[in-house]
Amino acid sequence: MPKLQLSELLSLNKVEQILRLAEINTELEQLTAQERVSWALDNLEGKPAVSSSFGIQAAVMLQLVTDVKSDTPVILTDTGYLFPETYQFIDTLTERLNLNLQVFTADETPMWQEARYGKLWEQGVDGLKHYNRLNKVQPMRRALDQLQVGVWFSGLRRDQSSSRSHLPILSIQNGVFKFLPVIDWSNQEVHYYLEEKGLPYHPLRDEGYLSVGDTHTTQKWEPGMKEEDTRFFGLKRECGLHEDDAEAEGSGI
């Protein structure tokens, strides 16, 4: 069976493209996460990579993908403002899973950014958009280009936020296949998988964090909060990585 080519899908009109992707996603919904990863590597044209923020449950996706293809590049967009525990977690998982870690950063250092723009995360939604564009979106775009990625794996899940609740397993984003093998997993399924494989959570989970990003835009969970409320002061959920560029530059995350 020939591999599914991005150019083939993009040559279809919008309706045909939607129908073709829907047909494939219907089939993928019947597979396990492990089977989905194998299917993607066998059937999608292009070099694979997996992005990771090394958050609370990051070990799941990293193990799933590298268990099938051990040399898959793992892309980290490092803002320079991660928790010390996150950097330690990165080292732990990189050594334990023998990860092919590829770190990308903004063109401007954190100190240059603060000198030029002030503390963007304190400047409302527009400031957060600017910050995320500099530190997450642009470095990721560069990573996909430099690594010549054709299949981008990510560990997004529908129950993490309302903005992710209708995401498909397979889509096209910014000119590459986007593939979400655990999109329909619950927190319980994640927990069982980590236990089964003997994999760790991020160390800050034990201190009350449900989601971990930068130190200045992450807070502990408190009663009455949704998981998405613990990031970006509750103003937004996404950092911009998981949207098409046109959308990110327009209505936002």
UniProtKB/Swiss-Prot annotation:
Its main location: cytoplasm. Pathway: Sulfur metabolism; hydrogen sulfide biosynthesis; sulfite from sulfate: step 3/3. One of its GO terms (biological process) is sulfate assimilation, phosphoadenylyl sulfate reduction by phosphoadenylyl-sulfate reductase (thioredoxin). Keywords: Cytoplasm, Oxidoreductase. CDD domains: PAPS_reductase. GO terms for cellular component: cytoplasm. Catalyzes the formation of sulfite from phosphoadenosine 5'-phosphosulfate (PAPS) using thioredoxin as an electron donor. This is Phosphoadenosine 5'-phosphosulfate reductase. The gene is cysH.
